[in-house]
């Protein structure tokens, strides 16, 4: 397959380099387009009215393109550069840190995959624990081999797969669980501080681990020790409310 590879951790991130190596080993043609620097939390943002520049990156057997933009910018530029031979698949990751629950709303990793499905291309987001329970290469090997087992005919256009690895060794995982997104996530605490000149500023604290929360969802199963696969879609229409409001009179 021709695969467009991206992330939000940046072109030099170990997760991107590791899965690049594994995909190439399996015979895929891999084209990395990733941010020049880390852009975690960029979500679906794009760089409007800002020049986007590209730089070829060579490092041993690795060849990729660094872009001074967001993860979504990287997918857009990548698709433009590959327009004569479009990718069969877009992979975003492997991210350093889980993207489950409400974190999905902020995730540049998931947003990059979502941009792929907006373009009509099958897309997957991979995330591992922030702490390296296993070497990054172990997650990459598993992720690359998992691709062989995914039946993309079961994933309609306009949807992606969001895959997360739990904070235990891959060998100790309970297996793979297909599940829904939780409405629970990390708690973000704001701290008001002052710089050396006494000027106040705000700082978002490091993540606070979530509790098990809502049963049968990605957060729940991840904490139980499962690898989670959650199908997501960019059409955010609330169908039940839509139907109810259609029956409502606004006159």
From Swiss-Prot:
The record's listing under Gene3D superfamilies reads: Survival protein SurE-like phosphatase/nucleotidase (3.40.1210.10)
The record describes how the cofactor is bound as:
Binds 1 divalent metal cation per subunit.
One Pfam family, please name it.
SurE
Q: Which UniProt keywords apply?
A: Cytoplasm, Hydrolase, Metal-binding, Nucleotide-binding
* EC number(s) from the headed UniProt entry: 3.1.3.5
Which cofactor does this sequence's record say it needs?
a divalent metal cation
Sequence positions that bind a divalent metal cation: 8-9, 40, 95
Which cellular component terms (GO) are annotated to the entry?
cytoplasm
Localisation: Cytoplasm
Q: Where the protein is mainly located, per its record?
A: cytoplasm
The entry assigns this protein to a family as follows: Belongs to the SurE nucleotidase family.
NCBIfam families per UniProt: surE
What protein am I looking at? 5'-nucleotidase SurE
**Species:** Lawsonia intracellularis (strain PHE/MN1-00)
